[in-house]
Amino acid sequence: SRRQRQMCIRDRGGDPQLEGGDDVSATLIGAALQAQEVCLWTDSKELHSCDPRFVKHPAMVKQLSFDEAEQLAFYGAKILHPFCIAPARLRNIPVRLLNSMEPSAEDTLISNLQDDNIIKAIAAKDHIIYIKFESNHNLCPYLFISKIFDIFAKYRTPLCLLVSSNLDVSVAIDDCTRLSNIISELRQYAHVLVEDRMTIVSVVGNMQWEYAGFEAKIMEALKDIPLRMISYGSSNNDVAFVIKNTDKKRALQALNDKLFQPEYAERN
C-alpha cells in the first residue's frame, strides 16, 4: 500500500482499486474465517458520543450493538464504513475499535449485546435536501403515497428519511442528481417545497418504546432550534431530525450537554 487505507494499487501506478474500505475487508475476512473477534485499528481517536470537531467535552462510547453502530456509520460516524457491520452481525462476531496511535487507550466493543444505556451517541449527516409534497387531491391518499415511492424508485434516488400523513409526505435525500426530474413528475399531484443545505441529526441508542422519558430530554435540548422533520427509526435504535446546516453545531452541543451530563447518565 502506498498510502494508508489504500489497497490493490497496480504495479504501474494508476488509481487504487479500493480506498477507505479496509474495515469492510476486515469484517468480510473475519466472517469467512468465522473469527472470534475482529479488531479494527484506526488512527482516529476513540469513538465519541458526538463529533469532537463540533462539540466540547464529548463522552467516549464503550459499547454499541450492531444496529446502533450501523446507524451511526450511516449518519456520519467517520470511524466506521456503513457496510462493515453486516458481515460481522451475520456471523455474530464482535468488532473492537482500537486506536493505533495510542494502543493503551480504551476501546469500543460492537456486538449483539445491549447495555443499559438508552442514549449512546449523536451523529450528523450533511448535504441533505428536504422536500415536502402536499397533496393537491388529484389522487386518493394511498395512491398519492404510492406514487411518490414509485417516482423516487424510477429515478433510483434513495430516501434517507420519510414522514407521511394522508395529505402530505416529507422526505430527506442526499442525492440531488435526478431531483429536477422527480419534482417535474410529482408537481401534477402535489405542491412541492424544497430546501437545501440541511442536516440530519440522529440520536442513536436503545430506544425501545417502554423506555419513557428520552424523547422529552431530546426535545428539551432542541427547544430553540427549528425542526423540519422528526423520524423514529424502524429498528428502535435512532430518532432523527432535519435541521438547517447553520443550526448543526448548536444542536449537537445542546444534545451532548443534555443527554450526556453525569446526572442523566446515572439514571440510565
What residue spans do the PLM features occupy?
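A generic structural signal for short, non-catalytic loop/turn and secondary-structure boundary residues
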Residues: 2, 90, 103, 124-126, ...
